[in-house]
């Protein structure tokens, strides 16, 4: 839906509801007024009805009485009167003065005017004034019998203190109220749509790069090689400007670097194991880092026969407390020492598949445990200077040598994969730690992240603790920063650096490329034409010089966007004369479906498409003959393919993510992760490229040929990285030494260091798999050959021991980095189409393939999401409910005969940790879950029953901004507010503590018991008891309710955690449904509070206990239901909510490193400081008017909060299916919408609309409801921002902290805020404005500070959202 249609829809929606409601209700009012006891013949038809003035509270305090600050009853026994505006009273005015110096009371309709009236009364049309006591005036009203002109809003009163009389002066302009009404109605919509438009134009663009890398990035070419590689003349190295220098001693010894990779090459043995960028960079390191001594640790794979090599003492590692031998062989080449590790677990891998297929099962745990322990032993044996870690595979190795530490550098080639195993219980922790041979203490201090054993986090923790966080780099200029933004494991670091990969073929420093001789156009075109023909012949395509040759080379996976290319291919083939070559190895299910689709496309377009889903060594003419290189990656750390094609003259078309976008070509931004958006962006880019002129293409190719990604630049940056890592390590060691020295001096202040951690008792005793970290060398080895035979018995023994593990699959968890949102509608890893039904269905439907449905119904992502939804539904029934039999189409069921499964089978290796150790039988649900859990898993409209109950907890809760709802509903009840806020703060701390220390089932079920107690007290307070007892019970009910309401953030963040993510659309659906219901609930709570407020005999406002059996009959069943929900949740919440809370080292530090958290906290504090004291008055404006009928306001409320909300919800969901950023950006685009909402309800502007006639009160409240809806949309957007920028654990803690800060700010606002006693000049009353006043009403600092802060925070929040959004690459 485009912007114009969206704007029209919002304006039409608002206009239709407001005008129709106002006109309909005004007709009813007009009919009733005709039968009233007074005459309207002399009253202008545009004037409001029922005026009155109310005396000031300050004057009443002189008589130890408090006047009625609610709406006073009116006297209707006058035949004629001036129908003026309804008035409110505040305890004070903006400046503390009751009257101006000239005796003039300005602004009849302002709060100051009502406060200044004192006890003055007009006696039967005379202007003479009399003074009465407040008690005598109770129930009285002041009447002005002359109406103002239609162009004015009210009167100003002139007092004569000596003569004791007053004069009236016309004040206010109806044009002002009309302008404010139109502004508040339309401006938020206009600014919201304008913000969306600007955001889309700025970020959702296709960048045409016609020159390649920026001049700044190529500035190194102006320097000589000596300057580039020259080390500092001094003995000092620097990390930061404010760091103290650390001396590095010169040594003749060359720096020794150890790195370990699963991809490697040994040229003299003709061995090359390489599938990606990591293998390329490992090979480059071995060729170019001649100034270092390199120790390269590699495993032996099963399909390669290795020559005889030098043998070395074997290593003995532990797996589940069992010794396991790893043989070691050495091979030397120049400055490289190859360390080859030989063991059965490594031999199971092949040269084409060196990595374990999963990283959350038993086989992979054994693999990486043996791998990392072996690396640790080699580090200790070789005495290296620094260990270079590549990705997560070897990140665990350094902790095995603690307390000895070594400098480390970490290169992130693909940070999305981190090496994860579940730690959902103490049993999981014991078994996984046993697999990896680490103690529980080390696991918690270094490795554990949430409820996962995270290898990448181990490396990050090691660098953070021992190098002050320095040493982690990305492989491109942007990838490091984006990795820091997207993955929570890096948030404890201040930043991630950059070490951009080079082009391995760009060897040597050449002259400035501008001075290079450019090829002749005709000659170059002839060479390209010949190479293009060779490429067409190689691929079996039709020889066609006029056809544009498009090439895709890469892994066939969702990350590389192969499904997007397959969906778009029919459209491109129909519209343009193109040929397509698509090659690369299959990786995941998306690649499998893309291969099936390309097979059909090849048959449909013979001679135009070549598809080969396997790893292929491409000849050079493929790169040199391609017209365009297609790179539709959803995420790309570096993008070596773009460099390889671009530097050979191909023009690039692809996504501008990670390291992509620096070569000449068309690059589209990936602001949204939805497939529909990516398809549209790729189609636009291809269209622009294919329609470009030959001259433009030649210029782009020439620019591409000049691009430089020199190896020498990378070597210089690598040198700096190594030096600084060693410096950071030495500096941290000095700090620890100083710290240890002072610890010895002051033993009363012990510090916990690595030695202390290791000295603690391990979790694994001999009787309970306890062990010390032990990696021993074994000397029994074959000294003559390097064969494939090894200690199979040991390995089989280890496998037999660990086969009893029963941990759940990590894919069921979503707390790590919300990775299910990182690539949009990404398929869950557990669905592998095991029975092949999905691929057969897809193949059958391809017979109806067209260019249109290829991007819609037959889109790979769309089809797999539909299948996945069906598969999850079948799995949900089979494993979680199973109350009735049904036929399963996509779920593969194992029978009892499948108990013994071969662990070597590829399918088994892709199953969760407990998939084959505990086979699932036919009665899976009844054997795994109790009856309560099965009941709560039953679905109601796709929502499991437990999610509905948890949603109820969110609906019943209130925020710190709404605390005055429970404080007696009136501003003068300060003590009640302080008590409520104090209870709310303490309760927040209690619920937060339960969440962090106990399984979440406790913090999610117990609040319902507290809610039940609150409703029980409410019922008791309505019984025939002494008045003071019922009053205290009413207050007790509110206090108890506040205790339960403080748990609200937990229900927001923890709900739906056990359900599989269905994309952002489902999140918006849930948010809109819950927000709509919560709005209704809060609205009627405010109505209840307004109606139940009363005066005692001293005219003090109290919460009136209603003595009625109907109240008991209504609230006690609710209390019983809530108590039942508590019991059901405690017994029936899914196993996910029963796992122990996981720890995250340096969690507070990581939270404060996120700017969106800081911005959110400031926003909450700002709102509570300026507006929390006024929320009750705003709701009094809505519900408490005497100018409206209550039932009509109820109808209007339901119409807006149900009817209008459903329409808005439908529109927002549709828009978010394509643009995942739409709702957050639209909400922030509304600007200071909460400020407008409070302004309209508290500044008297909404009380009297002279241009609207008797429909004015309803029209005014319709606008207030509309502003409330827009405020709710902004609130939903803010919630989505938190979910799209933080992990759920971070969101929970952020909301808890903000709740505490907001509550404390609410109390502070009652003392120091300019709005502590009323709107004051922060929300000035403009109803008395005249041109003579000029800018006086708004010429005050608090007004502008409040307004500017609210607008500025929206802008800041939007910038933080764009920069820290983890749902985009």
UniProtKB/Swiss-Prot annotation:
Q: One Pfam family from the UniProt entry?
A: Glyco_transf_5
What is this enzyme's EC? 2.4.1.183
**What reaction does this enzyme carry out catalytically?**
[(1->3)-alpha-D-glucosyl](n) + UDP-alpha-D-glucose = [(1->3)-alpha-D-glucosyl](n+1) + UDP + H(+)
Write the record's keywords in alphabetical order, separated by commas. Cell wall biogenesis/degradation, Glycosyltransferase, Phosphoprotein, Transferase
**Residues found modified as Phosphoserine:** 219
InterPro entries referenced in this protein's UniProt entry, alphabetically: Glyco_trans_1, Starch_synth_cat_dom
What's a Gene Ontology MF term here?
alpha-1,4-glucan glucosyltransferase (NDP-glucose donor) activity
Give the CC-aspect GO terms: ascospore wall; ascus membrane; fungal-type cell wall
EC class (word) = transferase
Listed GO biological process terms: ascospore wall biogenesis; cell wall organization; fungal-type cell wall (1->3)-alpha-glucan biosynthetic process
Q: Which PANTHER family match?
A: CELL WALL ALPHA-1,3-GLUCAN SYNTHASE AGS1-RELATED, CELL WALL ALPHA-1,3-GLUCAN SYNTHASE MOK14
Q: Which family does it belong to?
A: Belongs to the glycosyltransferase group 1 family.
Give the protein name, as stated in the record. Answer: Cell wall alpha-1,3-glucan synthase mok14
Record the organism: Schizosaccharomyces pombe (strain 972 / ATCC 24843)
The organism's taxonomy opens as:
Eukaryota, Fungi, Dikarya, Ascomycota, Taphrinomycotina
